[in-house]
């Protein structure tokens, strides 16, 4: 069988059995020939476009096929046309327990029925309870503050680092994602003909992914490749560096893991050069373990941010770390105090959801993590068997419940490696074919897939069967 054509980048558990892939498509009403499945979605989107630019409220949702989703339960989602899908997107990974997990939902209903409201003055018992849970179970967090989104948390982390160090320059990762604000809205999935060949040691030009970022500000941000300690030293030698921010695993472009000793090397360089090491665990935190991936790696950052799986889909984020740094939010000298404010910070609904989520993760001696690890391993082994059988040049990268198929002959170590070898076109085509047949992989190449506690062995088996069928047809 010939290999696929190259298209490199230059520019609470649900236990009901799942049907077979073909039965699934028939029962769900998903079209198998690719026509007419999303008529109601199109109608709703056309209405929305009259009032919302582009019809969506986040640019990441503007993907093909354009689908309006109306319901999520467990490991499944439904669209406006009645089509049902096994969900491996999980809204960019927050739904670690599954959609509408009963334990979390009950906690939210309870807090509302008990009269909780947004008070905007003083504090609440809920936020203190959540803060204690986090500080007790995450070694890197001695003190914590709450915000609404991961972007807010990374913004505040960088501001805090600049205040503490008295420096302005920061280091970010090419291909990483740390939010929408000016410090990090750059160098996402940059075409290689734009950023040029690999530089090590060295830095890449700031390539904004948004208009409206002042050029003067761009000069303070230095993108380098992941897994490259020499380039960290290079930047620190040239600029007074306030912070380095990175995901411990690059999960915006699949699953790119740190090389042996890399995170430990960042810790040593932070101590040597005096910059603040910020680990962005918005995607990795709670999904890979209560203490985050930093705990797994045995590395203690200065600051760490959490979100997504922290509240199983409810909007809340956390910024925590060393108390001596966090205390700058209440510094006795007003000229040194770092402003942190927000009307909706620690809103009782997402706060209750976060408490319930963490409680659920702690139950039964880690049954959630055992279950998703078992399913993740089954998915990886099944995919690898399919790829071998079909002779596909591809590998499977996985960490626990998160996985990605790379259509290349090795797991990438950074963006340059991925962009130069992965078959993006083939990847995206496979994802779209799977969606048409009731398996929802986010339809953008090299994006992480996520397994939840609500997925079952039957879900995994049905998914593997459908992937085998589609890859067989595509690779003939």
Spell out what each predicted region is.
Residues 3-476:
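Conserved N-terminal phosphate-binding loop of PLP-dependent enzymes in the Aspartate aminotransferase
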